[in-house]
């Protein structure tokens, strides 16, 4: 293991941002495939925490617990991010990191611009719609992804029912959660209140 990596206590707010796809060049750089279009975080944080998938952990290049690597340089390369990590000096060392998940502490993210949000912060928010004139719960955000044009919220449908202590999941006839895909665009999103974990929209409830 390189002395540049350390396995001290990992931050409690680690967020998975991508996965190392391969080595890049012959000087120890790695190529990362980001999980989202918000790859700028990979370029701006000072440390990545790498975790090897369980089936590969026996190789002991990176333990199954996160290990921190200092990011010396990072830049966008096509749809990927390439980076130089401290202590990774040749292609063999870089190839040994192939498959590792790349995480960073949420507290280390740069502040987003006005009216911009990190996708990880939207997950778990309740989505409401006032398409019928009054705010009604549509569901809870389970995932955010990019469809090539804009971000999309995958919402697990929920409903407030009398006598129930909280929202009740809506299921299809086979007992599977009902899902709704809602574009995260100004045309439909009216307000985001991260402190209240609430997003207001005008998305039709029966779209």
Curated annotation (Swiss-Prot):
Q: Name one GO biological process term.
A: ribosomal small subunit biogenesis
Q: Which Gene3D superfamilies match?
A: PRC-barrel domain, RimM
Pfam families, per the entry: PRC_RimM, RimM
Where do the PRC barrel domain residues begin and end? 114-207
Q: What does this protein do?
A: An accessory protein needed during the final step in the assembly of 30S ribosomal subunit, possibly for assembly of the head region. Essential for efficient processing of 16S rRNA. May be needed both before and after RbfA during the maturation of 16S rRNA. It has affinity for free ribosomal 30S subunits but not for 70S ribosomes.
Q: Which HAMAP family match?
A: Ribosome_mat_RimM (MF_00014)
**To which protein family does this belong?**
Belongs to the RimM family.
According to the record's subunit comment, the protein's assembly and interactions are:
Binds ribosomal protein uS19.
Could you tell me what this protein is called?
Ribosome maturation factor RimM
Taxonomically, what lineage is the organism? Bacteria, Pseudomonadati, Pseudomonadota, Betaproteobacteria, Burkholderiales
Gene encoding this polypeptide?
Answer: rimM
């Amino acid at each position: 293991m390189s002395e540049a990596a350390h396995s001290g206590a990992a931050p409690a707010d680690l967020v998975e941002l991508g996965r190392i796809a391969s080595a890049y060049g012959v000087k120890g750089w790695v190529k990362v495939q980001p999980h989202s279009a918000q790859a700028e975080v990979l370029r701006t944080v000072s440390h990545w925490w790498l975790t090897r998938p369980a089936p590969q952990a026996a190789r002991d290049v990176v333990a199954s617990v996160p290990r921190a690597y200092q990011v010396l340089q990072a830049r966008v390369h096509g749809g990927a991010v390439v980076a130089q990590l401290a202590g990774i000096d040749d292609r063999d060392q870089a190839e040994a990191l192939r498959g590792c998940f790349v995480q960073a502490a949420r507290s280390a993210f740069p502040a987003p611009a006005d009216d911009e949000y990190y996708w990880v912060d939207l997950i778990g928010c309740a989505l409401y719609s006032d398409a019928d004139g009054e705010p009604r719960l549509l569901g809870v955000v389970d995932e955010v992804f990019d469809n090539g044009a804009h971000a999309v919220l995958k919402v697990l449908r929920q409903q407030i029912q009398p006598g129930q202590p909280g929202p009740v999941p809506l299921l299809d006839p086979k007992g599977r959660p009902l899902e709704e895909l809602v574009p995260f665009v100004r045309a439909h999103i009216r307000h985001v209140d991260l402190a209240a974990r609430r997003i207001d929209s005008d998305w039709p409830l029966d779209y």
